[in-house]
Amino acid sequence: MTHDHKLKVEAIKRGTVIDHIPAQVGFKILSLFRLTETDERITVGFNLPSENLGKKDLIKIENVFLTAEQANRLAMYAPQATVNIIDDYQVVNKMALSLPELLEDVVPCPNSNCISHNEPVQSSFRVKKFASDVVLTCKYCEKEFERHAVIR
């Protein structure tokens, strides 16, 4: 007699699944993107096994559907993530993420002297993609930052 001791994250009937999030980043995504500001059920998995990443995080939100624009904002924190739209337990749309050219209200400016810290404005960065990194230029102080300096 064999016993299967694996627990699986329950499938959702309708909603959004954000998969292939780097381990330890899922909670940050939940918080920064205010994904918990819903009455719908949210299922999360942290440090799940992953062939590509070693470990990954996973977020499932029932009856909430991210647009491509919303999904692409996640690419700053989880560039290899995929966003799957689910209907009747089936993936009806699978989105690979791509950083937008303009990133607004996603990350704060690392320059402590930037006016975005003291004025009622949302952060805004122009995004330049290079083969090995991403450089963000703040709309207000015009300073350039590499991705790792911004996402902390």
From Swiss-Prot:
Keywords: Metal-binding, Pyrimidine biosynthesis, Zinc. It holds the Pfam family PyrI. Zn(2+) binds at residues 109, 114, 138, 141. SUPFAM superfamilies: Aspartate carbamoyltransferase, Regulatory-chain, C-terminal domain (SSF57825), Aspartate carbamoyltransferase, Regulatory-chain, N-terminal domain (SSF54893). Belongs to the PyrI family. Involved in allosteric regulation of aspartate carbamoyltransferase. Contains catalytic and regulatory chains. Its cofactor is Zn(2+). InterPro entries: Asp_carbamoyltransf_reg_N, Asp_carbamoylTrfase_reg, Asp_carbamoyltrfase_reg_C, Asp_carbatrfase_reg_C_sf, Asp_carbatrfase_reg_N_sf. This is Aspartate carbamoyltransferase regulatory chain. One of its GO terms (biological process) is 'de novo' pyrimidine nucleobase biosynthetic process. One of its GO terms (cellular component) is aspartate carbamoyltransferase complex. GO terms for molecular function: metal ion binding. Binds 1 zinc ion per subunit.
